[in-house]
């Protein structure tokens, strides 16, 4: 089940006519890591960072370290990883989402 943040992202992405993304995409077989949203053919990923103002797992010691390890592994495998917070989607969704679309477009000449 998608979080409120994931649902908000998906709604905004559709409104801006973004290409299809795969939710909860498993990119690392050994570690079973998943990316919140992925465009696998271009290796573009979106990670949504919830709980940043409520001392959520992503901003506490081990959780932050684990996320860094995951993002570094994705980057080493060629992924462009975009990290977004709820306020980034609220305050300037067009700028933040079109930046992701621009990289997808750059990596995939067949898309628009």
Question: What residues fall within each predicted segment?
Answer:
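Nucleic-acid endo/exonuclease domains
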Residues: 1-112
């Amino acid at each position: 089940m998608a979080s409120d943040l994931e649902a908000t992202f998906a709604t905004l992405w559709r409104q801006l006519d973004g290409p299809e993304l795969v939710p909860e995409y498993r990119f690392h077989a050994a570690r079973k890591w998943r990316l919140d949203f992925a465009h696998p053919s271009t290796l573009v990923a979106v990670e949504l960072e919830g709980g940043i103002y409520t001392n959520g797992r992503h901003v506490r010691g081990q959780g932050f370290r684990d996320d860094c390890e995951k993002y570094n592994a994705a980057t080493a495998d060629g992924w462009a990883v975009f990290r977004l917070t709820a306020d980034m989607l609220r305050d300037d969704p067009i700028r933040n989402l079109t930046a992701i679309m621009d990289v997808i477009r750059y990596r995939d000449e067949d898309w628009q």
